[in-house]
Amino acid sequence: MDKITRHPLYQTADIIKRAFLVNGFHLYDNGNSPEVVSADKTVELYALPEEAVLRPVMLEEGRYVLRTSLLPTEISRMKGRFPIKELICGRVYHAEDKELPGHMYLEGVFADRDIAAKDWEVFLDRASKEIYGISAKSVLEPVKKDMFRIVIRKDDGSEVTLGYTGYGNWLARALLGVEDEEIKVWLLTIDVDSVAMDLHHKESREVLYENLMATLKMCETEVPVCGDTLADQVSNILREKGYTEYIGSRIYQADAYIKMNMFQGEWDTNNKGMMLVEPLGKDGGNIWLPTVLTPGLEEVIAENYKAGEETVKIFDIGHVYLPGRDGKEPTEKIALSIGAYGPEIDAKSFKADMDELLSRLGISNHFFIPTDIPIPYDTKHCWLVMDENMSYLEGNFGGIGENARENYGIGVLAYMANFEIEPLEKKAASEYYFVPPELE
C-alpha cells in the first residue's frame, strides 16, 4: 500500500485549526475566498508591528493586488450574535519574498463583551497546548499600544512566536457592526509557514516548500484534512490512493504556457494571466498569475524525474485567475491538478483513478469523451469529462504531450489531469439532492 502523506505546511495549518476549533472557534473559510482583491480594498484592521506587515504584489497596472491579509474582505460577513469566534485559513502574498511570495496564514476574530487581555491570554494558552503539548505556555508580550506578540515557551526552555494579536481598530469594529463600547474585538494573525518550520525542523522556507518526493514521502499521516469542502474531500481521496500533495508555483514565468505546448499564438488569450507590475522570481522572470495549475505540475514532475524518482503520483489544489475583459472584474477559480508516472502507471490506470475520484465525490453520472484537440496532451490519450447531458464539467486528463515532455526534460510517459472545483461541487450536489419524479 502507498504511504498516506500530508504536506508539512498543510499538516501544521490543520493542527492550528483544530486547536482553535476545540476551543469554540468556527472555521469560517478554508481557503476559498479570493486571493486577488481590488487595490482600493486593501485596508488595515489593526496595527501589526512593522516586521509582520506585508507589501502587496501589484497587478494589472496597480488596479488589483494579491491580498496581504485574509480578514478585510470577509469580516463584514461575520456580523451576528456574540460571541463571534471565527477563523480563516488561506494564502497571502508578500512582494519582498521574491522567490516564495505566498505564505499560508490563519487569521481570527474574537468579539464579545468585556474580554480582557488576560481572558484572551488564557484562551490562547489552551490553544497553544493543543499545538505544542501540555508543557507549553503561551504569553502575550506587548509590542506597541493594543498589539501583542503571542510567544510560546516550550518545555525545553526555547521560545517561538506563534503570531500577533491585538484590538481591532475603528474600521474593524464598523465592519463587524459593533457600536457598544463594552464589546471588545480581538484580531489574530498566524504565519503558518513560520510555525511549520519550527514544528517540522525546517531551516528555511525554501526547504519547507521543496517538492521532492524523497522529502514529502517522509511526512506520513492518516489524519483527514481539517475541513469539509469538496476540495478537502478530493485531498483525502487522493492521499488515500497514494498521491502526494505538493505546492506548485503560483506566479509563472513568461514562457510557462509555451513550454507546456499550451500557447498557440498572440491571438490565444486564454493562457495570458494577470500581469504583475513588478516581476518576481530569482531572475525577475515571474510575470503573471496562473490560468491553470498544469505548468507548475509539469515542473514538479520534471524535478522528481531528474532526481531519480521511479514513480511519482502528485496533486495540487490552488487558485487560478482569468483577467477581466472589456473592463470586467477578473475571474478567480479553485483548480485541481493531478499528475503521475511510473512503471505501473499507464493511460488505463490513470483513467481508472480519475473515474474512482469522481465516483467517490458522488459524481456517478460522468463520461470520458476522447479528443485529439488539446495540444498540451498526447492526442492518442486525452479525454474530456462530461455529464449525462454531454455538458463539459471543466475537467480533462490524459498523457502529457511529447513536446511538453521534451521541453521539461521528462524522459518517461507521464499523465496529468486538470479540473475546476466549482463545477464538480455543483454536479455532486445535484446528484446528492436528486429526487426521481415518481417520488416527488
Language model regions located:
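TRNA-recognition modules of translation machinery and tRNA-sensing kinases, especially anticodon-binding
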Residues: 1-440
